[in-house]
């Protein structure tokens, strides 16, 4: 069993979806799991929908219409008129609108997961329909029936035991499987998400549960580069790299691989390949046990939009272990990933990522115990 993951850029239009079919045919359609992200920038578009919705701005409905039009155009390029994919797409969009109109929850993270997950639900529905149109025998699996998590919305933690059991029960080893990345569900069957760009992690979860022979992430770059080509000039391809080096690069911001992807693969020594969907015959980058970085060159990472918090004691007392423990517990509660820390006798500085936009809440709580500068 192999696992392929196709990200948003690799399913951004009808030509990209046709390309996926060609890639799959070239590798063989048996014993293959295809994990798919939302198409192009759909996740961003759904985040914009949510932002307007939470402001009671009815313009959110127009944004949903734009999402529908984008996907409808792709379908018109791929399918004949009167194909049932068109009514199916409308039904999915109707469910999204219905959820938002009937939602009573004030929990932003809960509403986020129920809303943004529609990107993956739409993309897999369209792509599976196209596979069938192209006479590929597929087995469609809703990832929410397999990947079970806790209630930590937007960055849910996996229930490994139950997830493995579900995957083994639902996946037929000799078939072509298509499923969603990024999403799962909790014990109450509410949709959860695994963190932004979490489809890589989904692929690793399926690979781990099924003892896959490999995972391939298909990207719009030739593999893992030694720097972001949007920031640095003359970047070079890393032909091979170890799990350890890859996870360090991913943790500190190399966006080509999701940070959580490597751990489950490393446990079972499942190799990871990062390849270009635009040039699939090229070898890309191989990530596996014991590989030394090749070529042996420096790697560069730039992380934008970071926030530096400086905390100091109100009464000039020392910042001790108890204080630091409290600070970290609050960072966890308010979903603030930590990038760097520095402490001294009476101060503590921490660089955090405000990707969940809860900085104001966090600062308000911390100011009850510390002087806080942002």
Predicted regions span which residues?
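Nucleotide/pyrophosphate-binding catalytic subdomain
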Residues: 1-257, 262
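Short, glycine-/Ser/Thr-/acidic-enriched flexible segments
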Residues: 8-9, 39-40, 183-184, 199, ...
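Short phosphate-binding/catalytic loops that engage adenosine nucleotides
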Residues: 136, 270, 336
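Structural preference for solvent-exposed beta-strand-turn elements
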Residues: 206-212, 267, 274, 347-351
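Short hydrophobic alpha-helical runs that function as membrane-insertion/retention elements
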Residues: 214-218, 272-274, 339
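A conserved active-site cap/scaffold subdomain adjacent to cofactor or substrate pockets
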Residues: 242-289, 293-312, 320
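A conserved regulatory-domain signal marking ACT and ACT-like small-molecule sensing domains
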Residues: 284-374
